[in-house]
């Protein structure tokens, strides 16, 4: 039997990191067991669902490298099919029309609140006669369709992450609403729990992997599966992603959408690598930097933790920095060039751009760090106070004068790393100036401060862009 998994996001907002991790776990497990990874867009919330969010989700999946195996389906295209199954449940007596008004439901909840009881429908219309139904309809009252839940029943299943889970019928909030309100004998638009079961069955889904916030929904859905004589899939409920305070990660935590991570300068490979270990502790992994292909070979749902997983910016940043260090230079330059173009910076040659990328990559945590790291190579920076103070040292300006005179005198030389070292050594010996003074003086001239990337490699780049002399001259 073919193994089939799915991601079923609701397009009511931007692609969230929680949804992305669920997608990743589904994709990894599908790869591990030789199954298929499918997409279903659950867009039955017509007020909040938007096509731009659907597009955003699909583009986010592509960016993360999570390819699906069949054309995505939209739940909204299958409303008539969902209604036909609600009709079957009505006909077999597993569901009924409920005419309880919104005001009556509010009154019931107020009473329960006063008594300290959880909100729960009292199933008052479960046994209406045909005459009573016709009376309500003639009065113009609208109805929802409710699915009967036996309060004495115990629902249990073996969860691949959590082991055996038990749920009591009495704790499910009363008979389950399957459809929105409608007039007469019409059936309103189907709601989440019914549509999910019908569509998972239609798609032949064998494994459902989703967040732990769906556990109560699973209990309800199992009852619908059984009422419709559908085969039950295997369920797995992943832990929530938590913020630093141990609370569920939300929009209040600033960055939650994949778009935001992308704009901040995270590589998709790094974000996927980090998300894979967010709540999963593999026994067989001997290192933390792994490709999706490598992760899929060792991925095991049973090793996913039950407790919530705290999001760590420090860990994500470290992983991203490792990927930046090891990314192909051509790809890194391509990414950097977008930042350079945005700032109107043009490298003098491809070779120069390649040398710059290699020089600054080890200092980068995020891709956008390339802006600050590249800036002093395109623009001459202002000399900071620490640099100005250092230039007050007599030997500092003398060092720069001697270096400048050497460059003017040897105008025809092509300065490379070896030649740069030779110049420093020669001047140091000839004029009895410490190399440290010479190099710090140059650093101030080039970068405006006493810090920066490798000086010798930087000098080679400044020489190629013909700005090394200009930078030295301004200090004299």
UniProtKB/Swiss-Prot annotation:
Motif ('KMSKS' region): 248-252
CDD domains, sorted: GluRS_core (cd00808)
Domain of life of the source: Bacteria
This protein's GO CC annotations: cytosol
Entry's localization field: Cytoplasm
The reaction(s) this protein catalyses: tRNA(Glu) + L-glutamate + ATP = L-glutamyl-tRNA(Glu) + AMP + diphosphate
Classification via InterPro entries: aa-tRNA-synth_I_cd-bd, aa-tRNA-synth_I_codon-bd_sub2, aa-tRNA-synth_I_CS, aa_tRNA-synth_I_cd-bd_sf, Glu-tRNA-ligase_bac/mito, Glu-tRNA-synth_I_codon-bd_sub1, Glu/Gln-tRNA-synth, Glu/Gln-tRNA-synth_Ib_cat-dom
Gene Ontology process terms (BP): glutamyl-tRNA aminoacylation
Annotated motif 'HIGH' region, positions: 9-19
EC number: 6.1.1.17
Signal peptide span: none
GO molecular function annotations of the record: ATP binding; glutamate-tRNA ligase activity; tRNA binding; zinc ion binding
UniProt-annotated binding residues for ATP: 251
Key words of the record: Aminoacyl-tRNA synthetase, ATP-binding, Cytoplasm, Ligase, Nucleotide-binding, Protein biosynthesis
Pfam families listed in its UniProt record: Anticodon_2, tRNA-synt_1c
Subunit-structure text: Monomer.
Function of the protein: Catalyzes the attachment of glutamate to tRNA(Glu) in a two-step reaction: glutamate is first activated by ATP to form Glu-AMP and then transferred to the acceptor end of tRNA(Glu).
Family: Belongs to the class-I aminoacyl-tRNA synthetase family. Glutamate--tRNA ligase type 1 subfamily.
Protein name: Glutamate--tRNA ligase
Species in which this protein is naturally found: Prochlorococcus marinus (strain MIT 9301)
């Amino acid at each position: 039997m073919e193994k089939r998994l799915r991601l079923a996001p609701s397009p009511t907002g931007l692609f969230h990191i929680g949804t992305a991790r669920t997608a990743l776990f589904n994709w990894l497990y599908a790869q591990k067991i030789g199954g298929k990874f499918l997409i279903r867009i659950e867009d039955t919330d017509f007020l909040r669902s938007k096509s731009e969010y659907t597009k955003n989700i699909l583009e986010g999946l592509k960016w993360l490298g999570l390819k699906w195996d069949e054309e995505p389906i939209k739940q909204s295209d299958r409303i008539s099919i969902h209604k036909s199954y609600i009709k079957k449940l009505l006909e077999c007596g597993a569901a009924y029309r409920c005419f309880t008004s919104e005001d009556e439901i509010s009154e019931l909840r107020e009473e329960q609140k006063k008594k300290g009881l959880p909100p729960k429908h009292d199933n008052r219309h479960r046994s209406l006669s045909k005459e009573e139904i016709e009376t309500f309809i003639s009065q113009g009252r609208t109805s929802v369709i409710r699915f009967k839940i036996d309060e004495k029943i115990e629902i249990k299943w073996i969860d691949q992450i959590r082991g055996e889970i038990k749920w009591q019928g009495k704790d499910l909030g009363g008979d389950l609403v399957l459809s929105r309100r409608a007039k007469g004998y019409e059936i309103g638009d189907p709601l989440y729990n019914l549509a999910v079961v019908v569509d998972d069955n239609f798609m032949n889904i064998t494994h459902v992997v989703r967040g732990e916030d769906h556990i109560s929904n699973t209990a309800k859905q199992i009852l619908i599966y059984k009422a419709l004589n559908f085969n039950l899939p295997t369920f797995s409920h992943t832990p929530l992603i938590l913020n630093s305070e141990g609370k569920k990660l939300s929009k209040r935590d600033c960055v939650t959408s994949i778009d935001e991570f992308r704009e901040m300068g995270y590589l998709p490979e790094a974000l996927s690598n980090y998300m894979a270990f967010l709540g999963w502790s593999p026994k067989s992994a001997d290192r933390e930097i792994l490709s999706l292909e490598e992760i899929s070979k060792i991925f095991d749902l049973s090793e996913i933790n039950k407790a919530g997983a705290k999001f760590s910016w420090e860990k994500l940043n470290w992983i991203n920095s490792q990927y930046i260090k090891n990314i192909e230079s051509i790809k890194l330059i391509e990414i950097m060039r977008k930042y350079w173009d945005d700032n109107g910076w043009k490298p003098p040659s491809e070779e120069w751009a390649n040398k710059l990328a290699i020089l600054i990559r080890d200092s980068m945590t995020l891709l956008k760090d390339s802006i600050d790291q590249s800036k002093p190579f395109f623009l001459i920076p202002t000399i900071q106070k620490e640099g100005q103070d250092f230039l007050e040292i007599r030997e500092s300006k003398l060092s720069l004068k001697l270096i400048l005179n050497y460059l003017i005198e040897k105008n025809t030389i092509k300065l490379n790393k070896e030649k740069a070292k030779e110049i420093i050594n020669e001047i140091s010996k000839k004029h009895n100036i410490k190399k440290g003074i010479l190099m710090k003086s140059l650093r101030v001239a080039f970068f405006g401060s006493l810090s920066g990337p490798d000086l010798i490699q930087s000098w080679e780049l400044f020489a190629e862009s013909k700005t090394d002399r200009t930078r030295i001259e301004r200090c004299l």
